[in-house]
């Protein structure tokens, strides 16, 4: 399985759609993209309500509401959903990815699955 895990903060929720679309447009498709969004942030007074979260008409994208673990939220928010021995790619919500990014990670992962990149 290939998972992409991402989180966002209130100041960047409006740009999340572009980043996720670039992940959906990959030459090597992920099996699942988890978007981890805390119910409440420890570092910010703002929150993200359900109606602020972009809707993705795609079964690959799953919104995970979770506790805020700071920068670790992008991994820890969905950690219990990963199958063992899977490729997990941590992505940023403010970046548009080249369409070959997942393909390249998968290539190197398949050569050395015990390494981190």
Describe the predicted segments one by one.
Residues 2, 59-61, 114-115:
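Short, conserved active-site loop motifs that form the nucleotide-linked donor/cofactor pocket
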Residues 85-96:
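Short beta-strand-to-loop acidic/aromatic patch adjacent to the donor-nucleotide binding site
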Residues 36-86:
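Active-site-proximal specificity loops/subdomain of glycosyltransferases
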Residues 19-31, 39-40, 55:
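Short, acidic, metal-binding catalytic loop of nucleotide-sugar glycosyltransferases
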Residues 18-22, 77, 103-105:
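A short acidic, amphipathic alpha-helical/loop segment
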Residues 100-117:
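Conserved donor-nucleotide/metal-binding helix-loop-beta segment in metal-dependent transferases, i.e.
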Residues 1-25, 34:
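N-proximal low-complexity "stem/linker" segments adjacent to membrane-targeting elements
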Residues 79-82, 95, 101:
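Eukaryote-skewed repeat-based solenoidal scaffolds used as protein-protein interaction platforms
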